[in-house]
Regions:
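Acidic, low-complexity, intrinsically disordered interaction modules
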Residues: 32-58
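Negatively charged, low-complexity tracts enriched in Asp/Glu with abundant Ser/Thr
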Residues: 1-29, 53-68
Length: 75
């Protein structure tokens, strides 16, 4: 997994480009999509989790699959 701070910066850039409302709390990101429940991104020891109301997704690194899944949740 990339450095956590680098990963958070990369995700923040992506969210800014997509005009998403979000807040960073330590190693967690909360995303507030319009008319949907909060989405959380959590950085654990060896994985990155995207947690939505419906499901949790785990990734070992930030890649196209990560951003594709995130995009489907925020739009």
């Amino acid at each position: 997994m990339n450095n956590i701070h680098d990963s958070i910066s990369l995700i923040e850039q992506y969210l800014d480009i997509n005009n998403a409302e979000y807040q960073v709390h330590g190693n967690n990101i909360e995303i507030y999509p319009l008319e949907k429940s909060v989405i959380r991104i959590k950085f654990n020891n060896s994985e990155i989790e995207i947690i939505s109301q419906a499901k949790e997704y785990s990734f070992d690194k930030i890649n196209n699959n990560f951003f594709s899944q995130l995009q489907s949740l925020i739009t």
